A protein has these predicted regions:
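N-terminal low-complexity, Pro/Thr/Ser-rich intrinsically disordered segments
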Residues: 26-53
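C-terminal motif of bacterial Sec signal peptides marking the signal peptidase cleavage site
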Residues: 15-18
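Cleft-lining beta-strand/loop regions that shape enzyme active-site pockets
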Residues: 47, 51, 125, 195-196, ...
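Bacterial signal peptide processing site
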Residues: 20-22
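Sec-exported extracytoplasmic/periplasmic mature domains
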Residues: 59-68, 82-94, 116-127, 137-150, ...
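Extended, small/polar residue-biased N-terminal targeting/export presequences
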Residues: 52, 67-186, 243-245, 251-275
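Bacterial N-terminal signal peptides that target proteins for export
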Residues: 1-8
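PDZ/PDZ-like domain segments forming the peptide/carboxylate-binding groove
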Residues: 106-108, 165-215, 219-223, 295, ...
């Protein structure tokens, strides 16, 4: 499980899929929904342009395989797609009389045929916009699911002079990021401030952790305590290259100033790229920071603790999951299993309430140490699987802030006929107590938010020790 366009691209590559469908007669809708797509068969070929046939395949793939595909009102997806199509026509100044939504009856196949006929009449009149209209239409259909683990991944390109480990963007991270920007923006809280400077334009401009961002391109990041869309401009994705103007405040000096940052490729600190980092606190506490549930990450955490345990008696473990965007639920389960056996860590449920049970891997050796887990709104997906299990099963204490609430369910991938990837969950996630975590998050046992002053000094706020 993962969230954001970059994360989506990583998920698509990790979970390569294959999906095929025969070309149906134009007078009929697609074959039965269940035959629209299939599970992975191999890596994708070269991507080609999206077409109405690709949109059709995705539509029936969703109806046949998505969590609520069998019960949802498919008209809502077609409506979302048509809204996006007409808005794009307006943006290009090319609106046409025929761009009216056809009548829909609730018959999924008949409705698709009506939609397709209207779509073709429109796009035949603006052939130079055909590719763009297909993209916005399919993006809107997928977004119409309202599911933070449903996405269509396409047009993923590396910028020139980009190498593994490099970054692209403005070169800094703020306290509102990742899942809060893309998956659950209602969770963001003011003030907006820099938490890490990674390189690039931000480093060249002299930004520092703790600097408060008062405006972005002239727009405030919060209105009446609610996040505004302006925050998304802090995280451009290639090929987005428009400069971003920030108004900043450094509280330690009272200085206010403005900078303009241009997105670009930058080298990142190699240490910051490590998935697992560890150190000893107070001569007896193992501190381990885990940035994502990558393959083999649980074993790497165990090895880090074992190294710190050599030659001394540990009194506890602090596992820092702040900013952990998720990854493999298998790794999350293995990590939980080092703190408890014979437990249910989660349920994965279909729309009719039939649930599969996720249990601890009792082949994992118990650490036998008290546990404190540091969480924040950047802890998403598999990170929330782990955190909810720790809290519900009383395996340790959560300290920090509530998690992201971006954990609808583990996504399954499908490769569409133009070699782009469609991903969404077939089941939705519930915590060990059968509670919904998605859009809500996991509350901490001790609420200890990070402040601009904490970020500026590089010190964590006081939190309970194991």
């Amino acid at each position: 499980m993962t969230i954001i366009r970059t994360a989506a691209a990583g998920l698509a590559l990790l979970l390569a899929a294959a999906c095929t469908a025969p070309a149906p007669p134009r007078s009929q809708a697609s074959q039965a929904a269940g035959t629209a797509c299939a599970q992975p068969q191999g890596p994708p070929g070269a991507e080609t342009a999206a077409t109405i046939d690709v949109i059709e395949q995705a539509y029936f793939c969703i109806l046949g395989n998505y969590y609520s595909g069998a019960t949802l009102d498919a008209r809502s997806l077609l409506m979302a797609g048509f809204v996006a199509l007409t808005q794009e026509l307006n943006r290009d100044g090319r609106d046409i009389p025929e761009a009216a939504m056809p009548a829909l009856t609730g018959d999924r196949k008949a409705d698709w045929t009506a939609f397709e006929n209207a779509y073709r009449k429109i796009t035949d009149q603006v052939p130079d916009l055909r590719d763009k209209l297909a993209v916005v239409t399919l993006e809107a259909i997928v977004a119409g699911l309202g599911d933070n683990h449903a996405r269509w991944t396409h047009d993923v390109k590396r910028p020139p002079d980009y190498y593994d480990g490099y970054g692209y963007g403005l070169g800094f991270q703020a306290n509102v990021n990742g899942p809060q920007v893309n998956g659950n923006p209602g969770t963001a809280l003011p003030p907006l401030f820099v938490t890490a400077v990674q390189g690039g334009a931000a480093q060249a401009a002299g930004l520092r952790p703790g600097d408060i961002i008062e405006s972005i391109n002239g727009s405030v990041p919060f209105i009446d305590g609610k996040a505004t869309p302006a925050i998304a401009a802090l995280y451009p994705q290639y090929p987005q290259a428009r400069p971003v103007r920030l108004r900043l405040l450094r509280q330690s000096t009272g200085r206010r100033w403005s900078v303009t940052l241009k997105p670009g490729v930058y080298q990142r600190d190699l240490a910051a790229l490590q998935v697992v980092r560890s150190k000893l606190l107070e001569d007896s506490i193992a501190y381990v920071r885990l940035t994502g549930f990558a393959p083999d990450s649980a074993n790497r955490v165990f090895k880090a603790i074992s190294r710190l345990r050599t030659g001394r008696t540990l009194s506890g473990v602090v596992l820092d999951l702040r900013g952990n965007g998720g990854g493999s639920p298998v790794e999350a389960t293995r990590l939980v299993s080092a703190f408890g056996h014979g437990k249910v860590t989660a349920y994965q449920c279909t729309v009719d309430g039939t649930c599969a049970t996720s249990r601890t891997d009792d082949t994992v050796e118990l650490l036998g140490l008290p546990l404190v887990v540091l969480t924040d709104r950047g802890c998403a997906s598999a990170c929330e699987h782990f955190s909810s299990a720790v809290k519900d099963l009383r395996l340790g204490r959560l300290v920090g802030t509530r998690t992201a609430g971006v954990i609808s369910g583990p996504a399954q991938p499908y490769l569409l006929k133009n070699n782009t990837t469609l991903g969404f969950p077939a089941r939705h996630h519930l915590g060990p107590n059968r509670e919904v975590i998605d859009r809500i998050g996991v509350p901490p046992d001790h609420h200890v938010p990070l402040t601009p002053q904490d970020a500026a000094t590089g010190r964590d706020p006081p939190w309970p020790r194991p």
